[in-house]
């Protein structure tokens, strides 16, 4: 049996997982499953040793190509998360300005300091 075959299958399943439409509701599940598959693949990669057969090298090249596609899709997800975090921070700042509109004003108006003794 080809030693690279399990790595190829896991990588292919990762690609399939990322091809499914990722929404806000299922994003956390997809990321969790991806992490699990990455850990599985890493365990298999650690046990993999040289020399490689011609078949294994060809399959390895396919895995590298798939991995580049997976990485691009994961970067898109990461960018979406960053945009959402920025929007959440803006909303939080905007909502706080309504609850305490004078929070940013640091003045001592209305205080009387008596210097006499």
UniProtKB/Swiss-Prot annotation:
Q: Which residues form a coiled coil?
A: none
GO CC terms for this protein?
cytosol
Q: What is its main location?
A: cytoplasm
Q: Enumerate the UniProt keywords alphabetically.
A: Bacterial flagellum biogenesis, Chaperone, Cytoplasm
Gene Ontology BP, a term: bacterial-type flagellum organization
Where in or outside the cell? Cytoplasm, Cytosol
Sum up the protein's function in the record's words: May act as an export chaperone for the filament capping protein FliD.
Q: How does it assemble?
A: Homodimer.
The family annotation for this protein states: Belongs to the bacillales FliT family.
Protein name, UniProt field: Flagellar protein FliT
Q: Which organism is it from?
A: Oceanobacillus iheyensis (strain DSM 14371 / CIP 107618 / JCM 11309 / KCTC 3954 / HTE831)
Q: Which gene encodes it?
A: fliT
